[in-house]
UniProtKB/Swiss-Prot annotation:
Disordered: region residues: 43-78
Name of the molecule in the record: Sec-independent protein translocase protein TatA
Keywords tagged on the record: Cell inner membrane, Cell membrane, Membrane, Protein transport, Translocation, Transmembrane, Transmembrane helix, Transport
Keyword Transport applies: yes
Assembly and interaction partners: The Tat system comprises two distinct complexes: a TatABC complex, containing multiple copies of TatA, TatB and TatC subunits, and a separate TatA complex, containing only TatA subunits. Substrates initially bind to the TatABC complex, which probably triggers association of the separate TatA complex to form the active translocon.
UniProt-recorded Gene Ontology molecular function terms: protein transmembrane transporter activity
Family label: Belongs to the TatA/E family.
Lineage: Bacteria, Pseudomonadati, Pseudomonadota, Alphaproteobacteria, Hyphomicrobiales
Pro residues biased stretches: 54-63
Localisation per UniProt entry: Cell inner membrane
Length: 78
């Protein structure tokens, strides 16, 4: 009772064909195919820039730092 038999699927298919008709279903499938094709094309375009080597990153520059006695001298005004 919980599973769908072949007759259930035939009735569902007949209702879908009556509601949408042959032309609308083929148009819908064409739109889905175009979407998949453009998605694959976008993925291929994203891969192309990754193949070209990028400029090496800049070496990090050390931050200037002070010794603790020099830092405390700046905090306390004379």
């Amino acid at each position: 009772m919980g599973s769908l038999s072949i007759w259930h699927w035939i009735v569902v298919l007949a209702v879908v064909l009556l509601l949408f008709g042959r032309g609308k279903i083929s148009d819908l499938m064409g739109d889905v195919a175009k979407g998949i094709k453009s998605f694959k094309k976008g993925l291929a375009e994203d891969d192309e820039p990754a193949k070209t080597p990028a400029a090496p990153p800049e070496a990090p520059r050390p931050l200037p730092h002070q010794t603790s006695s020099a830092a405390e001298a700046e905090k306390k005004p004379v």
